[in-house]
Amino acid sequence: MNRKKISLVFVFFLAFFLVGCTQKASDPKVDNWDKYQKQGSITIGFDNTFVPMGFEEKNGQYAGFDIDLAQEVSEKLGIHVHFQPIDWDMKETELQNGTIDAIWNGYSATDERREKVAFTIPYMQNQQVLVSKKSQNIQSVSDMKDKVLGAQAGSSGYLDFEGQPELLKNIVKDQKANQYQSFNEALIDLQNDRIDALLIDRVYANYYLQTEGILEQYEIFPAGFESESFAVGVRPADQTLLANLNKAFVELYQEGKFQEISQKWFGEDVATEQIKGEEN
């Protein structure tokens, strides 16, 4: 057999092997818990630029509050967690297609999203803020009149921006926000004065600017929207996974592990009343 034929045979068997090793997509219409237990894993979709919730470090490793929390939860569930970076703007589509089994990365539980996704109990609160350079002299929403705004496509902040135009959209330049695929891209444009302010999660803004040592160069102020709850999103049919996630959250708090992770990333206990078991 000549080299060309050998190469073709090798490529064929390699492709066959790789396909066989690929995790089969989950059926979006059924409870997949038995499947997860049999294969020993679930796939979590996340935005690998969302510091400090879940992000990729320079060495290629994943880190963040949600990454640590998911790993602790996976031990409770007795299954492995596979982290899959996704286009955040396509997260619900990825979930419904069965290519991921959960959305877990600072994912805000909004009424609009509840139409497609089943949420766990919320595990922490967040607020949408505006970040601007102090040199721009923008310190409140009213200062945003005719200013250029940036936001991440598909983010809860952008959904608020579009859904409640009277609070911010109607006053910014052209009544629109420049959309970015990642927060990092938006921050680069903010730093280079291509946008005047960035609509962003408070947890990201505080952590990133503090870590970079540039917090004193920026103004951070409320965007005017209600605070939001972070939760894990699964397919509505996956009720067993949903119940097990909720149980694991509460148990981790009772054991003090949730607080350890929270202190590591935020320097405080960010757990919701539901996680603490104090909800009326």
Pin down the residues of each PLM region.
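Short helices/loops that flank or line small-molecule/ion binding pockets
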Residues: 75-76, 84-85, 89-102, 116-118, ...
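Periplasmic-binding protein-like
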Residues: 48, 125-132, 202, 210-250, ...
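Flexible hinge/capping segments at coil-to-helix
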Residues: 35, 132-149
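Extended ligand-binding regions for polar small-molecule ligands
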Residues: 22, 67-76, 142-148, 153-155, ...
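Ligand-binding cleft/hinge of the Venus flytrap
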Residues: 56, 70-79, 157-179, 209-214
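A ligand-binding cleft/hinge motif common to bilobed small-molecule-binding domains
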Residues: 90, 107-115, 160-163, 188-192, ...
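C-terminal motif of bacterial Sec signal peptides marking the signal peptidase cleavage site
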Residues: 17-20
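Extracytoplasmic small-molecule ligand-binding "clamshell" domains
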Residues: 25-106, 255
